């Protein structure tokens, strides 16, 4: 009996011992297959060799220091050789946390389509557009990207030309957990009409951004007095959707002219996060200082937009659970016909559960401004609050919650609101309430009027707000 039990035990032991290594071998085989599919990149020469297999899968096996001015997969016309270059990367590159160091140029990849970039760190980049391609921009990783995916990308260094920190032009791309630490100091280029920079990417109406951060300081300076556009954004220009993104860098535009005219059909936009969204802006915030200066001129038709989160109004855009904690300011002159809009959070087709605690400061010599603690032009504004100081010196309207308001309810203001000047008006809730107003159940603690001005005296259609002794939040 004992021998039978021993035989059974030995058989079971043999099965266990033979099956376990087989499983381990299968796992090792899987890793071997993966390694065979992905090509290791260990040098600058290996990066260049990627152009021989555009749809390959690659990974960084070590840190790489770039010694030359690389621009892989170019797509441009060389006027010297009269050759049209059309190349595009369509594969994948996994940095595996390794670094690409000291890149200098217009963009490591010129063109990418349906490609995947992940876990890449680029340090000490120096971005500048060459004169022959001045009409284009610059970016650290990709110049032109179409239907690409970018995740866990971090770039640090500096930029001297218009462009973006990580990717310049995009079409239907997705960005997740990307971080820019690029400090950009952009000087106006007179031969191009648009001078701009975005921390992550320029973006488009089909691109999405999630959990991205800009930590770089971006400054654009110029002396424009003709048709021109100055734009600086912490994350992106245009997006389809943006969620849980944060800007902590300082965003600055300075325009100074010497001939007595500060801007003719001239536009300046500075924003902590994005210019425009075709969909939702959710859970985004700004803690950086946002500042625009347009001075030393005597006449202007300059259009000014300055905000902490989003710059442009779009009816399809909903802004939810966003905040501004940084100082937002404008100094100088703006347009009479196209007023300046300055606010803590910004604009949107609707805005809910947003707040501002930063200082909103406007000092104008000429032109009209609408200044709001939370929203520049309030439509469908609900459950928002302002606790920051809102001050206007010059001509225009300043409101604790909104500079201009047409529909808003259940909002409150505890911040101080002031307007100084012959034609300056302040309201604890709104600077100005429009004719189509549906404004009710708003509250404030200040001693001023609920609004600086309203376009109708017909009592049933006046905005409704209530002064209270205190608000707990």
Predicted features along the sequence, with ranges:
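Sec-dependent signal peptide recognition
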Residues: 4-9
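A periodicity- and composition-biased signal for non-globular, repetitive helical segments
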Residues: 10-11, 473
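Surface-exposed repetitive/solenoidal architectures
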Residues: 29-473
